[in-house]
Amino acid sequence: MTEDFLPINGTDYVELYVGNAKQSALYYQYAFGFELIAYAGPETGVKDRASYVLKQEKIRLVLTSPLSSDHPINAHIKQHGDGVKVLALWVDDAEKSWKETTSRGAVSVEAPKTLQDQNGEVRVASIQTYGDTIHTFVERKNYQGLFLPGYQARKSSFTTQEIGLKYIDHCVGNVALGEMNRWVNFYEEVMGFKLLLTFDDKDISTEYSALMSKVVSNGNGYIKFPINEPAEGKKKSQIEEYLDFYGGPGVQHIAIATYDIIHTVGELRKRGVEFLEVPSSYYDDLLDRVGKIDEDLQPLKELNILVDRDEEGYLLQIFTKPVQDRPTLFFEIIQRKGATSFGKGNFKALFESIEREQQLRGNL
């Protein structure tokens, strides 16, 4: 067994750069059941931006907006729209993580530094990954505060209701044609990840378009990053649409785990979150395809939840429509009942569903 030179304890937080963090924070609190726990902005001594930290179980989302027109974050928003900037990784030693990765070829975004306040200190360091996305290593073993130094505790202005979201299962990146293997190699060689699964254009294709995907995972399996690229097809694939509207590579979706997907999706739908729809015929022979499952078929059909089985068990999953006007970032809700895979049996149904949405937008 080779030593894991980059031990990661899990996802620390995901930061989105957005046009209006105050309004985005309200959306994620109301619709997704997150709770506001901390804030940084002019009132806390941060003059150039406002950041809201939202939490549910083990998930932390940070929503950040710039406060001036010439702020660098504005250039990011102008190019990409609202999108994921930081996939932060919780580590025991930020400096070692940064040294190990930069010595293997990672591009440094920020050298190790210490953030301090009355609750202790946090060490952070950042490297570049695909597009304008970065990984920040966060070492918080000497910190007792709510989030990071510079943030103050802040509570939601209304009573939020959790909907059963537990932790981030995986985060998916979209890269340009011919770039997937480059980034898989980056994660393998620079970050010590292992290739978990490969899907080619025969696995993920429709009459019109196709994509290819490889999944990399860190040593303990807590961090999983599928990476997609478009494949040759008759028409524009969903990955090409994303790349066009995002203005380059970036995070396509964040998959969040629940232990009761029927409850979670029921709540999301009640609060106005829109999901991709599959035809009702998907359910006609579902049990023949996946075998016995614990759930009743009727609520799955009503909520449009998909099911797939692998050697280890089965999973239930559903995908939101994009959560902003550009057809870019969306969320997946997933419940694993033993399955360790990613729903290969649903790829075709999902892809066709996305193409129907693309058609409506005039982008197919």
What positions do the PLM features span?
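Long compositionally biased, domain-poor regions of proteins
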Residues: I223-F225, G247-V323, L329-R336
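Core segments of cupin and vicinal oxygen chelate
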Residues: L6-N9, E15-R60, S103, P112-Q118, ...
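Vicinal oxygen chelate
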Residues: N9-G19, Y52-V53, P72-E100, R104, ...
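Extended catalytic-interface subdomain
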Residues: S65, D82-L87, K96-E207, M212-K214, ...
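N-terminal beta-strand motif that seeds the catalytic metal site of vicinal oxygen chelate
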Residues: M1-K22, V84-L87, Q144-V184, G247-I256, ...
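Long, C-terminal catalytic modules of enzymes
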Residues: E311-L315, R326-K337, S341-L350, I354-L364
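Active-site-adjacent "gating/activation" loops or surface patches in catalytic cores
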Residues: N220-E241
